[in-house]
Amino acid sequence: ALVFFIRPLNIVFGTMNSDLSFKQKMLLAWLAPRGIVAAAVASYFAIELEKNGIDGAQLRAMVFLLIAVTVLSAGLTGSFVANLLGLKRKSDQGWIILGANAVARALAKLMKSNNEEVILIDENPSLCRMAEKEELKVIYGNGLEENILLRAEVDLRKGAIGLSENEEVNMLFARRTKEVGKVPRTYISIKRDDEGVTADMVDEVGAIIPFARAIDLEKWSLWVRKEQIETKELIYDNKEEITAENAFDKETEGLILPLTFLHHTTLIPIGHNSSIKKDDKVGCLVRSEKLEQFHDWLSQSPFSISS
């Protein structure tokens, strides 16, 4: 009676003026409350009964047994019931980006436009406000702290991308997301291949270099802030596969910044090891003042502008 009648009735009255859906109320009725109040009250009444010469031990034992059974049943069946009601959050959903700089926001907006959930994390309040103005989800705080990562639901994410202007912090972020959330895919933005955090070091930790190569993130952020870039979508026309780092080599530095990679219906941030196949699409930023140079490169490349 307590589990199937009294507790659900309690939830119905307790959530009467809330915005919870019927299914959410059903889940609450199955999982809550857990019995701490009942335990305290039972102990109090047991003591009072014993003061009056009545054995209260049986009452206390019965209440604690009921609590143990209901907690155990909720723990074992909670996931199943949530899934049955369609309320269980799917794993492998969305991305976390460390940094809310202009490039990070440009990447987040492009991914969001393709129905990918993205959460930015940054300690800079002004950058967080800019992200909010652009209608992006952002968390203010240190992305290396476990509580911040848990707020971003790191354990449910497809991947994590370190895009701060400090490449050592990006490396630590990739490691922390794997430790805390077992994130399957991590990206580490670096400045150069042979100094500081190198490409070999990124490979050693099983991470990926975003943008297909090392980049000067500060310069690209400046160009984005000054609106000196244009967004382009390229389509790969060649039958032979090519890796992103070969497709966007040193000739494209300061000219093109590849951001995303679309294969069939799956969009992910492009990495140095992304394998580009025929009809795959690459979302990128192009310097406005170098459009002529971009078109010259395009005419000799295996890409064309997606219509």
Question: Which role fits each region the language model picked out?
Answer:
Residues A1-F4, L28-G35, I67-A68:
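Transmembrane helix-bundle signature of multi-pass membrane transporters/permeases
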Residues A1-G14:
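Transmembrane helical segments that form the transport core of multi-pass membrane transport proteins
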Residues L9, M16-K23, L27, A38, ...:
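Cytosolic regulatory regions of ion transport systems
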